[in-house]
Regions:
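Conserved N-terminal subdomain of the carbohydrate kinase-like
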Residues: 2-11, 31-115
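Phosphate-handling active-site elements
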Residues: 33-38, 198-200, 226-240
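Short, small-residue alpha-helix embedded
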Residues: 24, 147-148, 209-233
Length: 271
């Protein structure tokens, strides 16, 4: 095992050939938050800012082998999951995670790419809800993902609270429902429902841009990085909110579609 005191954080997700989301976004975020990042790749995708052209899942046994390889040599301080393809991958992740359940787990329940391409089989939603999500310290669904997981429609802040309560009834601990898909045109209100039932609303100005590829990955990765450094759930989520807002504000103008965010913007703003 490594003896370094540098926080070491693991991401389990798909590879984005365009570099804006998935493993690539996670590792950039880890670097910016001063933690050492490792990765387990669940799928190789051919994608760019205009969409996903192909998905090639990595064999489940290879996913397990990558994970056990990392765990055998590194002091993993936090784990973040992203694209997990289907229920069998989720069950495999849950199986291995139960052996290291003291490590904080952040789940980004990735279901659909920014361009609309499905990244999770519909049949896997129940596996995510019943088996994997209850293992997480934090789960970070957007509105459509929260609707699928809570099996209800969300059209108001009251609905967001109700969805979070439903997820807690299923065993989820701390839930962040991201309000970026909500109807409020001026603000994005995220709900952090702590495991003790406390509701914390995090409001930010809505930024008028389509340069939002990888925002969900980046947000969850930042939470994992902060948890890996020993911060509380609330502190970690608040930092991640500031980090992603800076990244969206200072987008890079790369590509011809939904471009990536600027992962070094938060650091530049605070230099």
């Amino acid at each position: 095992m490594s003896k370094s005191k540098i926080p070491q954080v693991l991401t389990i997700a798909g590879s984005d050939s365009g570099g804006g989301a998935g493993i690539q976004a996670d590792l950039k975020t880890f670097q910016e938050r001063d933690v050492f990042g490792m990765s387990v790749i669940t799928a190789i995708t051919a994608q760019n800012t205009t969409g996903v052209q192909g998905v090639h899942p990595v064999p489940i046994e290879m996913v397990k082998q990558q994970w056990t390889s990392v765990l055998s040599d590194f002091n993993v301080a936090a784990i973040k999951t992203g694209m997990l393809v289907n229920g069998e991958y989720m069950k495999a992740v849950a199986e291995v995670y139960k052996e290291v359940a003291s490590i904080p787990l952040v789940i980004d329940p990735v279901m659909i790419a920014k361009g609309g391409h499905p990244l999770m089989e519909k049949s896997a939603v129940s596996v995510m809800r019943e088996i994997l999500a209850p293992l997480a310290m934090v789960i970070t669904p957007n509105i459509p993902e929260a609707e699928a997981l809570a099996d209800m429609s969300i059209s108001s802040k009251e609905d967001m609270v109700k969805a979070a309560e439903r997820l807690q009834e299923k065993g989820c601990r701390n839930i962040v429902i991201k309000g970026g898909h909500a109807v409020d045109e001026s603000h994005a209100d995220d709900l952090l429902m702590l495991e003790n039932g406390e509701q914390i609303w995090l409001r930010s100005e809505r930024i008028d841009t389509k340069e939002t590829h990888g925002t969900g990955c980046t947000f969850a990765a930042c939470i994992a990085a902060e948890l890996g450094k020993g911060h509380s759930v609330e502190e970690s989520v608040r930092t991640a909110k500031k980090f992603i807002q800076a990244a969206i504000r200072s987008h890079l103008g790369i590509g011809h579609g939904h471009g990536p965010t600027n992962h070094w913007a938060y650091r530049k703003e605070h230099e």
